[in-house]
């Protein structure tokens, strides 16, 4: 569940970055590279594609090192791991109040944006084109994560159908308890 919570917080932080450029933000699409360094200094690198649509829909499509899809809509989280032929379904007890969280990001003199969500501080960076470039944070387990975004598209049309998961026939569906 900590992993699912981390995905929600990263997406929330990403939305916070985008909000700083205006209230008309409706969607984001980007390729990403995520590097998580544990307390022992051992890095794990992930890459994939993310799409998000306000107020609370997101799909993480991990390509490497293993394929994984994560769908989020409000407080519902679905994680599909094709290699395991398994779908995990859960509901988070606390769904994010996106407007309040988005408004909490504060611009610092160095041009970065900082916010704190559930005791975790997020540092948000933008590029010269005023698009989100990077998010850095250390989670409650001491894992330092850097999320680098590339090929960022803002406010493009994204069909709601892209956020609907239909489980393949024969996969195991595991219901996880709410957190």
UniProtKB/Swiss-Prot annotation:
Entries under InterPro entries matching the protein: LolA/LolB/LppX, OM_lipoprot_carrier_LolA-like, OM_lipoprot_carrier_LolA_Pbac
Job description of the protein: Participates in the translocation of lipoproteins from the inner membrane to the outer membrane. Only forms a complex with a lipoprotein if the residue after the N-terminal Cys is not an aspartate (The Asp acts as a targeting signal to indicate that the lipoprotein should stay in the inner membrane).
Family classification: Belongs to the LolA family.
Main localization of the protein described in the UniProt heading: periplasm
Quaternary organization: Monomer.
Short name of one Pfam family: LolA
Keywords of this entry: Chaperone, Periplasm, Protein transport, Signal, Transport
Name this protein carries in UniProt: Outer-membrane lipoprotein carrier protein
Annotated signal sequence range: 1-22
Compartmental location: Periplasm
One Gene Ontology biological process: lipoprotein transport
Gene3D superfamilies: Lipoprotein localisation LolA/LolB/LppX
SUPFAM superfamilies for the chain: Prokaryotic lipoproteins and lipoprotein localization factors
Organism: Helicobacter hepaticus (strain ATCC 51449 / 3B1)
Cellular component, GO annotation: periplasmic space
């Amino acid at each position: 569940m900590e992993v699912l919570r981390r995905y929600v917080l990263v997406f929330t932080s990403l939305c916070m970055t985008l909000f700083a450029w205006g209230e008309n933000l409706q969607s984001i699409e980007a390729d990403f590279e995520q590097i998580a360094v544990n307390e022992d200094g051992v890095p794990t690198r992930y890459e994939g594609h993310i799409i998000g649509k306000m107020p609370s829909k997101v799909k993480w499509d991990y390509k490497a090192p293993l394929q994984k899809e994560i769908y989020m809509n409000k407080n519902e989280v679905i994680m599909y791991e094709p290699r395991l032929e398994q779908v995990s379904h859960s509901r988070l007890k606390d769904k994010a109040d996106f407007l309040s969280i988005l408004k909490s990001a504060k611009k610092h003199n160095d041009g970065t944006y900082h916010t704190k969500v559930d005791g975790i501080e997020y540092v948000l960076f933008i590029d010269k084109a005023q698009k989100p470039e990077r998010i850095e944070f250390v989670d409650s387990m001491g894992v330092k994560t850097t999320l680098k975004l590339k090929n960022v598209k803002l406010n493009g049309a994204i069909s709601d159908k892209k956020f609907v998961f239909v489980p393949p026939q024969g996969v195991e569906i595991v219901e996880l308890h709410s957190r």
